[in-house]
Amino acid sequence: MAKIFLYAVARQSDATALERAKSLINTSHSIDGVHPMLSLMVPLADDPFGYVPGVSFERPSFVIEIAQPMGKPLEPAIRLLQPQLTSLLELLDRNKTQVLAGYHRAFKVTGKNQLIYHYLMQKKAGFRSVDYLDYYANNHCQFGIATPGIDYYQTYKDAEFTHELAQRWGVVAATAENVSEMHMNDVNELLHGEGIAEVSRGALADEELFVDRPNSRMFTMQLIARRTL
């Protein structure tokens, strides 16, 4: 599955921009057999993962996800949604809004989706993208699979497409190498699930090998709308 994340930061009113984002999700219509899957998420006000603001990544007002099924290109979906996206972008701070496009892979799926955790991960100095992603996809993913109480996904960035979209929309290209996604119905399942302490220790130790943790960003969101056109 190919996917785009738009980490939207409102220029003035979060509420006004969010209403326009809801309109994009709820009023768009399929044309010529193009059926993108759209999702809208808002960060939790009391996020237990302690989002730390940073110069490189502003806390988003909301996040829009645009996805196409395997074998279906994203470009027709973008053309379909472009009028609504253009209207939405007028309300966003384009110097803080970021986009990331990539290949989405499902590792563990049971249908949990009320809360969605994103971890935008940066590679450690000395690692090329190929080095980083090779280690992640073939080794580090074991910790996400072993985490109890969650569904687990990865989106690996397509740097060329991400930069192209950033230029097209006048926003910032995300510098993260990937987005680690954990979906859950209750954040306590992740915080206090049986065996989570041991998995967390192993994951943190492994990340020290290849992840630039101080410049990576994590936060949890509430899914408020999802629709396939």
Residue ranges with predicted function:
Residues 1-229:
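Macromolecular interaction modules
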